[in-house]
Amino acid sequence: VVFDDVYIEGITKISAKDIRYAKEMGSAIKLLGVARNTDTGIEAYVCPMLIPNDHPLATVNDSYNAVFVHGDAVEDAMFFGRGAGELPTASAVVGDIFDIVRNIKANCCGRIGCTCYKELPVKKMEDTYNRYFLRLHVEDRCGVLAEMTEVFAKYHVSGAQILQRDSQRQDDHLEEVV
């Protein structure tokens, strides 16, 4: 995978309100790096994702990182540990120094990589299927919800939940979360 083909989006667009709504929907928002081999190409992206609270990745917080792997033989496996802070950073630096020393002693530049390489297309982010939520500012009138569902149906968008809060009322509008 060429790095430029990987879709990357940070967390700067995520608000405290987004986090509250995700929590109300039984989910957490996590910044994930995803690599998935599909029949139509490789999915490779880094972006905030909505994760159900019962998924092991939803419990990864603070300076901890995790790698979640799903494979034919292992099914689901998660590797979990500190990924930031004084000791993990020092450990990574020491590991890099050992690699450099090994390379100097062996008179080579790096280890032998995978020799089973196969070029596959990387899918565009808009061609992947994921869970999202939309926060819509809509008029407070009869029929708005029906109009929203009509538009979703037209574009084959399936909604799992709809949240409507009177406390989010602004002028003659409501905030709907789908």
Model-derived regions, located:
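Structured core elements
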Residues: 30-31, 45, 68, 78-80, ...
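A generic structural motif
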Residues: 34-36, 70-72, 137
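Glycine-rich, flexible loop/turn motifs
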Residues: 56, 75, 121
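A conserved regulatory-domain signal marking ACT and ACT-like small-molecule sensing domains
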Residues: 92, 97-178
